[in-house]
A protein has these predicted regions:
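Conserved SAM/SAH cofactor-binding pocket of Class I
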Residues: 65-116
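Class I SAM-dependent transferase core
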Residues: 1-75, 112-113
């Protein structure tokens, strides 16, 4: 997707990200939808740095998902303060969507970012 001439997502970047942080097919589908929605909104609102669009999968998605490996085993309740464009909270929520009892709370003080 090309957003205001800022560059398209590099397909090789997505492959690199998935090699770094493998996910289930269901999680991948949720992540793809999130990235698609983020890039659509990015056309009207600056949610991520425009220069990071080509590498959104490694720079933002994989970077967010690596937090799952740093958390205590079985951590189910997460909070993302200053969520902005949804990183790292929404990728973590995508990964934990099938985990019973998992909750991810996103907190954002800027109204237009919170509306996203």
């Amino acid at each position: 997707m090309n957003t205001r001439g800022q560059g398209a997502v590099d397909p090789a970047d997505k492959a690199r990200a998935l090699a770094l942080t493998p996910v289930s097919r269901e999680t991948l589908q949720r992540l793809e939808l999130f990235v698609e929605l983020l890039l659509l909104r990015q056309q009207r609102q600056n949610l991520i740095g425009p220069s990071t669009i080509p590498v959104i999968w490694t720079r933002h998605v994989a970077d967010s998902l690596q937090l799952l490996d740093c958390a205590p085993a079985g951590a189910k309740i997460w909070a993302d303060f200053g969520s902005g464009g949804g990183f790292p909270g929404l990728p973590i929520a995508c990964a934990l969507a099938d985990t019973p009892g998992a909750m991810v709370h996103l907190v954002e003080s800027v109204g237009k970012k919170a509306n996203f």
